[in-house]
């Protein structure tokens, strides 16, 4: 019957629209596009399913062509264990055929400064959070287990950046973390 066909078509159209909105699949580019979705999507998705967003975004992009490569941005956790767990969860969901076609960039999120009062410098809380994240990245990169075999998680991380406009947060807030991590040479002892 035509009513069922019409309803099914409406369902498919809405489902496609919703999926594209969730994974930011549209014609707009830049941070404004990213920021407009990032805050909202976590409100509707349970934390247990959040890693599936990366599967949908990465595979959705890669399946549209054979010569594609994507660098997905992820916010680093503040412990080595948190970083390993999140990257492992993202990687295990993505189809094996795309294994060499994606990587990750650790993405520090800028925030508006909340003044703490006299005696505290600008972005006091954010600088401490970034310090914890930078140290966790250092530990993650230094741990031999994260380099080994098919679970070479460190090799999947190819960069580091800070997101958002400089209106709310100036570059020097991240300078120490970037200098610390840039100078981090990895040497893995052979046993």
What name fits each language-model region?
Residues 1-191:
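Metal-cofactor-binding active-site regions of metalloenzymes
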